[in-house]
Amino acid sequence: MPIKAILTDIEGTTSAVSFVFDVLFPFARAHLPDFVRQHAEQPQVAAQLQAVRTQSAEPDADVERVIAILLEWIAEDRKATPLKALQGMVWEQGYNAGQLKGHVYPDAVDALQHWHQQGYRLFVYSSGSIQAQQLIFGCSEAGDLSGLFSGYFDTTSGPKREAQSYQTIANATGFAAEEILFLSDIVEELDAAKAAGMLTCGLARDGGVLAGHRHVNSFTLIDPASF
């Protein structure tokens, strides 16, 4: 069955892991306190602050205490939904102000544009929120790439190392799993996608081996028609 759609990871695949850890996370950590103070009364922000109080079992926490909790979660690298939502809001403000530009490897830009022109449907699956995904591609160093993609998926579709998540995504795209090529730099994610019936290709940008999967070190070496 020929490939009709391509599902790609972001961190370590289309984009440098260092962009997330060395640029995005520090930017959010630096700007989150003032952002929360300035926007605490806005409904979408207030809802996330209330979620922090609930998850931390501190229902009476004031804004400064909530900020302290958020900074603790950042230090612990906790994947808390309200933290991710607030980080996304801070990043959006940064992208819109031109303070941030999404990193996408040039080889990934070229390949994604080429595949789109060839008629492949392109999708994203990342542990980062859908909003964060859209910002990386929509405000990238290479310009607005958002028009290349037909859909975005995050962990609301399930954990990235569980096969059921990939079946859920296949169902949402309208393609059979066997018609989808999944790209990632993490072997456990590739294993899960393969177990769901997808075809896989690993990105080993720094060399190395992704056991059990075809793997390359550049998007330019991926020919979807060869799978």
From Swiss-Prot:
It catalyses: 5-methylsulfanyl-2,3-dioxopentyl phosphate + H2O = 1,2-dihydroxy-5-(methylsulfanyl)pent-1-en-3-one + phosphate. One of its GO terms (molecular function) is 2-hydroxy-3-keto-5-methylthiopentenyl-1-phosphate phosphatase activity. The keyword Metal-binding applies. Its cofactor is Mg(2+). Pathway: Amino-acid biosynthesis; L-methionine biosynthesis via salvage pathway; L-methionine from S-methyl-5-thio-alpha-D-ribose 1-phosphate: step 3/6; Amino-acid biosynthesis; L-methionine biosynthesis via salvage pathway; L-methionine from S-methyl-5-thio-alpha-D-ribose 1-phosphate: step 4/6. GO terms for biological process: L-methionine salvage from methylthioadenosine. Keywords: Amino-acid biosynthesis, Hydrolase, Magnesium, Metal-binding, Methionine biosynthesis. Binds 1 Mg(2+) ion per subunit. It comes from the Bacteria. Signal peptide: none annotated. Its EC number is 3.1.3.77. It is an enzyme of class 3 (hydrolase). Monomer. Bifunctional enzyme that catalyzes the enolization of 2,3-diketo-5-methylthiopentyl-1-phosphate (DK-MTP-1-P) into the intermediate 2-hydroxy-3-keto-5-methylthiopentenyl-1-phosphate (HK-MTPenyl-1-P), which is then dephosphorylated to form the acireductone 1,2-dihydroxy-3-keto-5-methylthiopentene (DHK-MTPene). Belongs to the HAD-like hydrolase superfamily. MasA/MtnC family. NCBIfam families: enolase-ppase, HAD-SF-IA-v1. HAMAP family: Salvage_MtnC. This is Enolase-phosphatase E1. It comes from Pseudomonas syringae pv. tomato (strain ATCC BAA-871 / DC3000). The gene is mtnC.
